[in-house]
Amino acid sequence: MTGKKRSASSSRWLQEHFSDKYVLQAQKKGLRSRAWFKLDEIQQSDKLFKPGMTIVDLGAAPGGWSQYAVTQIGGQGRIIACDLLPMDPIVGVDFLQGDFRDELVLKALLERVGDSKVQVVMSDMAPNMCGTPAVDIPRSMYLVELALEMSRDVLAPGGSFVVKVFQGEGFEEYLKEIRSLFAKVKVRKPDSSRARSREVYIVATGRK
């Protein structure tokens, strides 16, 4: 019975995925993923990126966000990206493969950032979902807390933080914490984010 349910669920997901207009557009444009469009929508509304910026990209693979951001920051900008999964090279992106939760990986990431502060920390990290909110939400909240901690360590005053969060237990407390650290905080649900998904994007600007 369980196998049939998983098979049906997987079939629905695949059908939805390959008929998704943003997936089709991404394939047509040669983009790494549909996530490119989510960040584009956020940039249109919140103007996070400017030429010459330094950015940290967490949960970067397969590279949709980094691929978009390099078009906004130009040749003088720099992106330090990290993911557990491999990612094909992108010009202007310094990629570190490893588990962000591992202290050695975190140390290596901070070494790549160096002494200079960054202007944007962005996180599209998500755990491997099992479909049970009581398990998935705490796993997700742990990752977004780590991303926020990273932003505290490396963001310059006035810097920005954008993070994918799955709504559920702990969301309001997390949002409150971010509001204490940034001058302006918005919760975005891009059109390119699937309607039935719990995901939203917190966009925080003006690091205090």
Swiss-Prot record:
<comment type="function">
    <text>Specifically methylates the uridine in position 2552 of 23S rRNA at the 2'-O position of the ribose in the fully assembled 50S ribosomal subunit.</text>
</comment>
<dbReference type="InterPro" id="IPR002877">
    <property type="entry name" value="RNA_MeTrfase_FtsJ_dom"/>
</dbReference>
<feature type="binding site">
    <location>
        <position position="124"/>
    </location>
    <ligand>
        <name>S-adenosyl-L-methionine</name>
    </ligand>
</feature>
<comment type="similarity">
    <text>Belongs to the class I-like SAM-binding methyltransferase superfamily. RNA methyltransferase RlmE family.</text>
</comment>
<keyword id="KW-0949">S-adenosyl-L-methionine</keyword>
<feature type="binding site">
    <location>
        <position position="99"/>
    </location>
    <ligand>
        <name>S-adenosyl-L-methionine</name>
    </ligand>
</feature>
<dbReference type="InterPro" id="IPR029063">
    <property type="entry name" value="SAM-dependent_MTases_sf"/>
</dbReference>
<keyword id="KW-0489">Methyltransferase</keyword>
<dbReference type="GO" id="GO:0008650">
    <property type="term" value="F:rRNA (uridine-2'-O-)-methyltransferase activity"/>
</dbReference>
<feature type="binding site">
    <location>
        <position position="63"/>
    </location>
    <ligand>
        <name>S-adenosyl-L-methionine</name>
    </ligand>
</feature>
<dbReference type="InterPro" id="IPR050082">
    <property type="entry name" value="RNA_methyltr_RlmE"/>
</dbReference>
<dbReference type="InterPro" id="IPR015507">
    <property type="entry name" value="rRNA-MeTfrase_E"/>
</dbReference>
<feature type="active site" description="Proton acceptor">
    <location>
        <position position="164"/>
    </location>
</feature>
<dbReference type="InterPro" id="IPR004512">
    <property type="entry name" value="rRNA_MeTrfase_gammaproteobac"/>
</dbReference>
<keyword id="KW-0808">Transferase</keyword>
<feature type="binding site">
    <location>
        <position position="83"/>
    </location>
    <ligand>
        <name>S-adenosyl-L-methionine</name>
    </ligand>
</feature>
<dbReference type="GO" id="GO:0005737">
    <property type="term" value="C:cytoplasm"/>
</dbReference>
<keyword id="KW-0698">rRNA processing</keyword>
<keyword id="KW-0963">Cytoplasm</keyword>
<dbReference type="Pfam" id="PF01728">
    <property type="entry name" value="FtsJ"/>
</dbReference>
<feature type="binding site">
    <location>
        <position position="65"/>
    </location>
    <ligand>
        <name>S-adenosyl-L-methionine</name>
    </ligand>
</feature>
<protein>
    <recommendedName>
        <fullName>Ribosomal RNA large subunit methyltransferase E</fullName>
        <ecNumber>2.1.1.166</ecNumber>
    </recommendedName>
</protein>
